[in-house]
Swiss-Prot record:
Protein name as annotated: Release factor glutamine methyltransferase
Organism: Mesorhizobium japonicum (strain LMG 29417 / CECT 9101 / MAFF 303099) (Mesorhizobium loti (strain MAFF 303099))
Gene: prmC
EC category name: transferase
Residues given in the record as substrate binding sites: N196, P197, P198, Y199
EC number: 2.1.1.297
This protein's UniProt keywords: Methyltransferase, S-adenosyl-L-methionine, Transferase
UniProt keyword Methyltransferase present: yes
The keyword S-adenosyl-L-methionine is annotated on this UniProt entry: yes
Gene Ontology process terms (BP): methylation
Amino acid sequence: MADPLPEALGPLLREARARLVAAGVGDPALDARLIVEHFSGTTRTQAIADPERTIDSNAIAAIDAALGRRAGGEPVHRILGYREFYGLRLSLSPETLEPRPDTETLVEAVLPFVKAMAAREGTCRILDLGTGTGAIALALLSAVPAATATGVDISAGALATAARNAGELGLGGRFTTVQSDWFEKVSGRYHVIAANPPYIPTRDIGNLQDEVRDFDPRLALDGGVDGLNPYRIIAAEAARFLEAESRIAVEIGHTQRDEVTDIFKAAGYASVAALRDLGGNDRVLVFQWG
């Protein structure tokens, strides 16, 4: 059994880090700081300026439990219950994929088009397929006040999380949700269809990092036998929901650029752009109809 955690902030941070080092956590200093700050309500500045600051017993107990969860492999943002994405704080739930920085590449890929369309037409209607936390749609809405978005997900729990995030960010008036298996219950036409679909081949799910495999919902990971099923569905069905001038943007696995491009071209789309993520991997493809 671990020794009791110190009550003073500075020693508490050091002990939290030591526990995570011992557990083999990848970034123990950062995760320890995030956990201590979140559950104690303190800041990094306070830790530097007042390391002897006393932390109350309830916070100590919460930190102790959180460190145990992190040492057991649970991702730190699952423990905190939120993650930052494109400068927005998004709540997480068991039904949602944890949004990651690579997906910000998709936001950047379509943002100029969304801005231009909103400036010209007075609005830009966005459809976010598999919305999860609402990350993609809400990032675009936060950047373009004239835009509106519909978040689609098969999971009612994910949609509840996305709607809650929209409300907390003051974007609820421009964000609606539809529970649907892809386009099944979608109506209307959109200037942008965006998706970060499941793209992991079924056979590879077991080889994912523990933090992904054990805590992200399988529904948001499994793209079928070859990982390409969602792209086939989107390419086959999207055209009837698109405005005459429009874009489709999809996140892809880093080895899938050619295969996904071929799927969309075979369905009548033209390639507009291919973007890499911060790690230099192929990550986002943008298409237009015709």
